[in-house]
C-alpha cells in the first residue's frame, strides 16, 4: 500500500511540475519537434535521392515531401520505401525455393516439346522458367471463361464436386449474394469432411464482415487474412497486397484470372453494368503449380507447412493437353519483377501483333517504349481499356499515355458495353497471358500476382475471338480529336500521371 501511495505521489508531483512549467515546455517541445521533423524530412529526401530509383519516381517523392512535409513524411514511411529485399520477403523467397526443390523432378523443362516451338517462343518460356521456377506443361487442359456468370457457374459446380480439399486465395471477398453462395457451399463441404482453406487479403477484403468469417470458421473452414491491417498500427506491409485469385480443388481442377468474389463481378452493379472479365479453368499438370503457389502463400501467413504428396502428387493432375501452359507467380518476394519482364519479352519478340486488355494501364518507361517501337515497326498493337473510371486517378493517368501511343501508331480502344476488367496480352495469335496482373506499376513492383502463360492452345484461339468481339463493343480513340481535348482534361491527366509512381 505504501509503495502505491509513493507512486501516486510521484505522478502527482510530476503532473504539477509539468503544469507549472507548461509554457516553457510547450515552446521547447515545439521547437525541438520542428527541428527533429525537419531533419527527418531532409534525411528521407537524401535516402530517396541515393536509392537510385527511376528519376520520375525520385522526383515525385521529393516534390511530395517539399509540398506536403507532414503528410508526405508519413506517406513515405508507409508507401514509399522499397521492401522487396526486406528480411521478411527474402525469407519467403528462400523458403519458396526450398519448396520448389522438393518437387524438382516434376519441374524440369520438357526439352522435346520446347524444340517444337519457334526460337523466340523457346526463349520466352525459358525466361519464364528461370524467373518463375515453374516449367511449361503440355499435359494440361484449359478453358477461357469470358465473364462472371460463366466463371462462377463453373466454379460453383466444381466446388460442389470437391471430395478431399478446397483451397481458395482471393484479393476481394464480399458478404453479398455471391459471397453467401460460396460460403454455403464451403460450409456444406467442410461438414462432409472436405478440408477447406481460405486465404483472403487483409486490405482488399477489409469490408468483409466478422460474422461471415466466424460462420465459416465455426463450420471448420480455415479462414486466414493475408497481411491484415491492425489500426492504428500501420506498417509497410499495407502496400504489398495479395492480388492473386486462385482456386484449387482436390489438386485436379484449378481456376485463375481477374474475377474476385462479389455481386458486381456478375454485372449486378448499376454503375458498372456488365462486367467483362477473363478467367481460366485449368485441369491437369499445371494445377500442381497453382497448388504450390497457394501452399507457399499459406505457409508464409500461417507458418504451417503442408508441402507433401497428398497435395502435390503428379498422379493427381495428368491429362491430355492441346498446347503449353505455364503458371507464373510474381511479387515482392521474387528477386525479379517477373511479370513485367515476361510482358516485355512478349512485346519485344512479337512478329505480327500485340493485343492487350487492362483495366489499369500505367506502363513504366520500358513497356511504353517497347509498345511504341513495336507499332513504329509495323506490328499491329492494340490496347483495350475501360471507358469509365473504377479508380479515377488511375483512369486519368492511363489516358495521359494515349497521345504518344496513338502518334506511334498504337490503336487504343475504350470498351463501352460495361466495365472492362480483363487482364490479358496476346502475341501473334500464338502466345497469351491471362491472370491477375494489370499493365501497371503496382502489379509489376508491389502486388503478389499470378498469371497463366499459354502457347498454341485452343484457349489462345478463344482469346483472339473474344478480343475481336470486344472491339465490336468499343470505341477507337481518334488521335486528332483526342489531342484537341479540353485543357482541363489534360491538366487532370498530367497531374494523375505525375502521381502514378505513388499509386
From Swiss-Prot:
PROSITE patterns: PLD. It comes from the Bacteria. SUPFAM superfamilies: Phospholipase D/nuclease. The active site is at 243, 245, 250, 421, 423, 428. It is a multi-pass membrane protein. SMART domains: PLDc. It is found in: Cell membrane. The keyword Transmembrane applies. The keyword Transmembrane helix applies. Keywords: Cell membrane, Lipid biosynthesis, Lipid metabolism, Membrane, Phospholipid biosynthesis, Phospholipid metabolism, Repeat, Transferase, Transmembrane, Transmembrane helix. Gene3D superfamilies: Endonuclease Chain A. One of its GO terms (molecular function) is cardiolipin synthase activity. One of its GO terms (cellular component) is plasma membrane. Residues 238-265, 416-443 form the PLD phosphodiesterase domain. One of its GO terms (biological process) is cardiolipin biosynthetic process. The chain crosses the membrane at residues 5-25, 30-50, 59-79. Belongs to the phospholipase D family. Cardiolipin synthase subfamily. This is Cardiolipin synthase. It comes from Alkalihalophilus pseudofirmus (strain ATCC BAA-2126 / JCM 17055 / OF4). The gene is cls.
Amino acid at each position: 500500500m505504501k509503495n502505491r501511495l509513493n507512486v501516486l505521489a510521484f505522478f502527482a508531483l510530476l503532473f504539477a511540475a509539468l503544469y507549472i512549467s507548461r509554457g516553457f515546455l510547450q515552446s521547447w517541445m515545439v521547437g525541438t519537434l520542428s527541428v527533429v521533423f525537419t531533419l527527418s524530412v531532409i534525411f528521407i529526401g537524401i535516402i530517396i535521392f541515393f536509392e537510385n530509383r527511376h528519376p520520375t519516381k525520385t522526383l515525385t517523392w521529393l516534390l511530395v515531401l517539399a509540398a506536403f512535409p507532414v503528410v508526405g513524411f508519413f506517406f513515405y514511411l508507409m508507401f514509399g520505401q522499397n521492401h522487396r529485399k526486406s528480411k521478411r520477403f527474402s525469407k519467403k523467397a528462400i523458403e519458396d525455393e526450398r519448396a520448389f526443390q522438393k518437387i524438382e523432378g516434376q519441374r524440369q523443362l520438357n526439352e522435346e516439346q520446347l524444340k517444337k516451338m519457334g526460337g523466340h517462343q523457346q526463349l520466352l518460356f525459358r525466361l519464364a522458367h528461370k524467373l518463375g521456377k515453374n516449367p511449361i506443361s503440355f499435359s494440361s487442359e484449359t478453358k477461357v471463361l469470358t465473364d462472371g456468370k460463366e466463371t462462377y457457374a463453373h466454379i460453383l459446380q466444381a466446388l460442389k464436386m470437391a471430395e478431399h480439399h478446397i483451397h481458395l486465395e482471393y484479393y476481394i471477398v464480399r458478404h453479398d449474394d455471391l459471397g453467401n453462395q460460396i460460403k454455403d457451399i464451403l460450409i456444406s463441404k467442410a461438414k462432409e469432411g472436405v478440408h477447406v482453406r481460405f486465404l483472403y487479403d487483409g486490405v482488399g477484403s477489409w469490408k468483409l464482415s466478422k460474422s461471415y468469417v466466424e460462420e465459416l470458421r465455426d463450420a471448420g473452414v480455415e479462414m486466414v487474412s493475408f497481411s491484415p491491417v491492425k489500426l492504428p498500427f500501420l506498417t509497410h506491409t499495407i502496400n504489398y497486397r495479395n492480388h492473386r485469385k486462385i482456386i484449387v480443388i482436390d489438386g485436379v481442377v484449378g481456376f485463375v484470372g481477374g474475377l474476385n468474389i462479389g455481386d458486381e463481378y456478375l454485372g449486378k452493379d448499376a454503375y458498372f453494368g456488365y462486367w467483362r472479365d477473363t478467367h481460366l479453368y485449368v485441369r491437369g499438370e499445371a494445377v500442381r503449380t497453382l497448388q504450390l503457389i497457394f501452399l507457399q502463400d499459406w505457409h508464409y501467413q500461417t507458418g504451417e507447412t503442408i508441402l507433401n504428396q497428398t497435395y502435390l502428387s503428379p498422379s493427381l493432375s495428368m491429362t491430355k493437353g492441346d498446347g503449353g501452359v505455364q503458371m507464373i507467380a510474381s511479387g515482392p518476394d521474387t528477386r525479379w519483377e517477373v511479370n513485367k519482364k515476361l510482358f516485355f519479352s512478349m512485346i519485344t519478340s512479337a512478329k505480327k501483333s500485340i493485343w492487350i486488355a487492362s483495366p489499369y494501364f500505367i506502363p513504366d518507361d520500358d513497356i511504353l517504349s517497347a509498345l511504341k517501337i513495336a507499332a513504329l515497326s509495323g506490328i499491329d498493337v492494340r490496347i483495350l481499356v475501360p471507358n469509365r473510371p473504377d479508380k479515377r486517378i488511375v483512369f486519368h493517368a492511363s489516358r495521359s499515355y494515349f497521345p504518344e501511343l496513338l502518334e506511334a501508331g498504337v490503336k487504343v480502344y475504350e470498351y463501352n458495353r460495361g466495365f472492362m476488367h480483363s487482364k490479358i496480352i496476346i502475341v501473334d495469335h500464338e502466345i497469351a497471358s491471362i491472370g491477375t496482373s494489370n499493365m501497371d506499376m503496382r502489379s509489376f513492383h508491389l502486388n503478389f500476382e499470378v498469371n497463366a502463360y499459354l502457347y498454341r492452345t485452343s484457349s489462345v484461339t478463344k482469346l483472339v475471338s473474344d478480343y475481336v468481339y470486344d472491339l465490336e463493343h468499343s470505341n477507337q480513340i481518334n488521335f486528332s480529336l483526342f489531342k484537341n481535348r479540353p485543357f482541363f482534361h489534360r491538366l487532370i491527366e498530367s497531374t494523375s500521371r505525375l502521381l502514378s509512381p505513388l499509386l
